């Protein structure tokens, strides 16, 4: 009986001591968050996983953000939304040198995992880095280098990872989050291009998990995350500290340039000077040609991309693809051309009136463009029509002389 009592007393102590047993693993896993860079592809920052093993002298970085620039079909694949990225692994020193050369900081978060959990993650990363496993289809806001790193930590460690709320009560949209980085980096023209080509799927409000497609938001999520009821991050430090360079001030933003152009074209449109009218003929040809090209690109990306980011794009309501052929005959004074521009004028006014009701955030630089379209289509729609002279006419002359 005493033996049973002793066993019953020692049995729970065995599990308590096992649970309290310190991690004797020499593995160290950390998340690396890189600050935004000057180039568009680096504007949103970057994420990677660092694995260190002091006993074997291993200090490697696993990076899901590499792709092949030299692929001859890269542009065609990019247009279709087929962006093949890969997991690459290389030394931590090489990683730091790369970001030092780009003048970008690196923040490191040490993850508090058991020895078994760290080994599982390390093994999964090694398997994922094999040539037959390393490639994946990249989708900017749903499956990228940051979401891959998060999913490996959550799914491959075996730990029960929980994230606390990191977004405000009124959640931002994907476009709001993207704009934050573009504005901070002074990427005004890139912001316009993104807003023109990406449809209203980007205007959906993000969930807590979806916000972590951005490196800073994953870092913020890990700061307050738990793993098996304890803090997931034990320590946070600067692996590479570089002061960010503020973007240089410039007036040459899309809004300023297009607003100035709107004023100039508006004044010239009311001029009766022949040189001004000749200039406007050339301007209209180029302007509507560019609008038509933008419309063709919008519709093409909407139709052929396999993802959804370019679908349901309301910018097609003002950048009409039909402008492309019309641009070559814009100077002609024809009835059908007059009717076309009257229709364009009405459509442009309707788009401007419905601006705040469109379920897509339209870039503010589009407003002066709409003004230019409205002015030029109004004047083109009210030009005097040149009457055609019949090509074949028969002139009959009658003589007043009496017939003898």
Language-model region placement:
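Hydrophobic alpha-helical transmembrane segments
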Residues: 197-205, 231, 258-262, 288-291, ...
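Core alpha-helical transmembrane segments of integral membrane proteins
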Residues: 225-308
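Short, highly charged low-complexity linear segments
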Residues: 206-220, 252-256, 354-363, 381-388
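Generic detector of multi-pass transmembrane helix bundles and their immediately adjacent loops
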Residues: 271, 282, 286-404
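Residue-level signal for alpha-helical transmembrane segments in multi-pass membrane proteins
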Residues: 11-18, 268, 301, 329
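A generic alpha-helix preference that emphasizes hydrophobic side chains
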Residues: 15-18, 45, 146, 293, ...
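Soluble extramembrane regions of membrane proteins in the secretory/endomembrane system
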Residues: 21-242
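Bacterial Sec-dependent N-terminal signal peptides
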Residues: 1-22, 386-404
